[in-house]
């Protein structure tokens, strides 16, 4: 890796660590949202660096839909145990009682009830006043215009027309009781930055990011990996083994794989350099309707 690229990554690292420390010092009860993906892994690594050799001064929170890949659950538990992190797991009890699932109820309702409402329940339950998230501005257009300190009202709603100015490195964390701030320390990172930093720092990631032969079927222009026996096969669908990997991770029925032979980090980085598509091309929740991500965020999504 050339010196300019290394310096660039260290600048991003320093900015993120500064933000994480600012939140820990400014807020009474922060939490780090942990979705188990590559961005969460980088964010957790940065947080551990920020407070080394001490432990994290806040817990990790995983909002569980019950539909993550099995490898993600195993990785989550292994990571929390290895680093001695306090891990909180919340699953929307009303959604569980209703039997909400992406095959029967669709991606929009599943996401709203199991993710958005589940997150708001957890934030209210524990009284968190700040929540770290791993979103980046290069991922999606609504995230591109969101501040690093993203103000949320007492209903956890985001108003893109009422954002606070962020001049230089001055962040406004002033809130009233019941309000909160979502904090995005990776805002200025790109997907390429994330992968190069993972390689540079030797950060452990879910194996699903690396190409391997996996059982998939084609549905709605997406390669769906069949992760358990809850699959609802439609007429004419056939499960086949194909060489695939994932650029982004979520609920397995709503996350499409991409055909790839990149089995190492350098091969993933090389693949990213020539890619012309968004990493979120395989996320079904982004296809619900025009501007669906912004609408979800207005309602309290990550």
UniProtKB/Swiss-Prot annotation:
In short, the EC number is 2.7.7.4
Species this chain originates from: Salmonella typhimurium (strain LT2 / SGSC1412 / ATCC 700720)
Q: Which GO terms describe its molecular function?
A: ATP binding; sulfate adenylyltransferase (ATP) activity
Q: Which UniProt keywords apply?
A: ATP-binding, Nucleotide-binding, Nucleotidyltransferase, Transferase
Q: What's its job? A: With CysN forms the ATP sulfurylase (ATPS) that catalyzes the adenylation of sulfate producing adenosine 5'-phosphosulfate (APS) and diphosphate, the first enzymatic step in sulfur assimilation pathway. APS synthesis involves the formation of a high-energy phosphoric-sulfuric acid anhydride bond driven by GTP hydrolysis by CysN coupled to ATP hydrolysis by CysD.
Task: Work out whether the entry's keyword set contains Nucleotide-binding.
Answer: yes
Q: So what family is this one in?
A: Belongs to the PAPS reductase family. CysD subfamily.
Under the heading InterPro entries, the entry gives:
PAPS_reduct_dom (IPR002500), Rossmann-like_a/b/a_fold (IPR014729), SO4_adenylTrfase_ssu (IPR011784), Sulfate_adenylyltrnsfr_sub2 (IPR050128)
This protein is called what? Sulfate adenylyltransferase subunit 2
- Record's subunit section: Heterodimer composed of CysD, the smaller subunit, and CysN.
Its recorded reaction(s) are: sulfate + ATP + H(+) = adenosine 5'-phosphosulfate + diphosphate
The UniProt entry, under NCBIfam families, shows: CysD, PRK05253.1, PRK12563.1
Leading EC class: transferase
Q: Which GO terms describe its biological process?
A: hydrogen sulfide biosynthetic process; sulfate assimilation
> Which stretches are annotated as coiled coil?
none
Q: In which pathway does it act?
A: Sulfur metabolism; hydrogen sulfide biosynthesis; sulfite from sulfate: step 1/3
Which Pfam families does the record cross-reference, listed alphabetically? PAPS_reduct
Q: Tell me the CDD domains matching this sequence.
A: Sulfate_adenylyltransferase_2
